[in-house]
């Protein structure tokens, strides 16, 4: 009887401790680590989110930029942080999926070192665009023109956005176009080179191409998401012409593995409320992104696992070897 009583008391203490934890968190400023430098689109989104969450929780969510090494340093930092609810990571497709297949050894485990908190964006497509003087207006036109001029056209992509490189290779090989693949380390330089005709085709984020599209120097012809992007509803998806080709990105919030479930649930609720705002949804669309809401922590974790499986399959198809 005494043992049973002790066990009941222990359980009660644990329940009360969780409840107190949920009520008192956050009692001080907490960090949101961002794997890019200040001013990048990812950083702008993270700061926008942090500002909204800070106001809801009455504590500053402080953005800390840790750029470099394909986001590896930032992810390693969060993976090693104390799971106390005061360190979170604004992560993306590259950090949790593409790095997994791009590097033989990572100093963090994308599948074990993090606790999923919430989705921010589940649609972050790439876009296929062409130099405005190229005599093509649709994806079918481009496919026919490339095959008729095999080896004479090039497709540029930004290697700092891992999804773009995969998208370029997938499109080129599945359609058997024979495009010369030209990697760039700078999206700005890439877009200018396509605008000036150095390269004829590019795959980029919607936002990266916006200025040259607005200037009339580049024509967008297709989007790489599974379905049409809500921000550009008249732009066809690649899959409408080439079924099965889809390259999408995501952004999510994760925490160090072992972060208390009640804290994770609380932050998830606040992010969910924030993302419901039509103004915020419109701002995300201006970045070339879309959201269906924060989802649940469990749903976010499953989404990430599905994405990891998807990118592994793509890497195998494209014979991409980890470095």
PLM regions with names:
Residues 1-4:
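Positively charged n-region of N-terminal signal peptides that target proteins for export
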Residues 94-105, 165, 169-174, 201-234:
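A ligand-binding cleft/hinge motif common to bilobed small-molecule-binding domains
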Residues 27-29, 173-177, 261-323:
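An extracytoplasmic/periplasmic, membrane-proximal ligand-sensing/linker region
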Residues 80-86, 101-189, 238, 243, ...:
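Hinge/capping helix and adjacent helix->loop/strand transition within the periplasmic-binding protein
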Residues 22-112, 152, 176-205, 212, ...:
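N-terminal (or domain-start) structured segment
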Residues 30-32, 39, 46, 63, ...:
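Residue-level signal for nonpolar/aromatic packing positions in well-ordered secondary structure
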Residues 16-22:
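Sec/Tat signal peptide C-region and signal peptidase I cleavage site
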Residues 6-16:
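Bacterial N-terminal signal peptides
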């Amino acid at each position: 009887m005494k043992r049973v009583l002790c066990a009941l008391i222990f359980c009660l203490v644990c329940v009360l401790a969780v409840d107190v934890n949920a009520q008192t968190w956050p009692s001080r400023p907490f960090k949101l680590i961002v794997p890019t430098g200040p001013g990048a689109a990812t950083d702008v989104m993270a700061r926008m989110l942090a500002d909204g969450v800070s106001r809801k929780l009455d504590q500053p969510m402080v953005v800390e930029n840790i750029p470099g090494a394909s986001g590896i340093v930032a992810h390693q930092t969060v993976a090693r942080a104390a799971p106390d609810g005061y360190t979170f990571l604004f992560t993306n497709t590259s950090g949790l999926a593409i790095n997994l297949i791009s590097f033989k050894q990572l100093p963090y485990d994308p599948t074990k070192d993090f606790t999923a908190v919430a989705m921010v964006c589940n649609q972050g497509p790439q876009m296929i665009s062409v130099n405005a003087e190229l005599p093509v207006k649709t994806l079918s036109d481009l496919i026919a023109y490339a095959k008729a001029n095999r080896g004479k056209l090039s497709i540029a992509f930004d290697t700092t956005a891992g999804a773009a490189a995969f998208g370029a290779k997938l499109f080129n090989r599945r359609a058997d176009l024979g495009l010369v693949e030209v990697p760039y380390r700078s999206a700005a330089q890439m877009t200018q080179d396509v605008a000036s005709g150095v390269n004829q085709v590019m795959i980029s984020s919607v936002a990266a191409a916006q200025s040259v599209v607005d200037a009339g120097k580049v024509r967008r012809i297709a989007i790489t998401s599974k379905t049409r992007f809500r921000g550009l509803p008249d732009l066809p998806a690649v899959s409408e012409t080439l079924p099965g080709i889809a390259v999408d990105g995501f952004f999510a919030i994760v925490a160090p593995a072992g972060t208390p479930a009640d804290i994770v649930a609380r932050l998830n609720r606040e992010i969910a409320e924030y993302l419901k705002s039509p103004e915020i949804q419109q701002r995300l669309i201006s970045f070339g992104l879309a959201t269906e809401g924060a989802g649940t922590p469990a749903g976010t974790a499953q989404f990430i696992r599905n994405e990891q499986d998807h990118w592994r399959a793509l890497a195998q198809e494209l014979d991409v070897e980890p470095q």
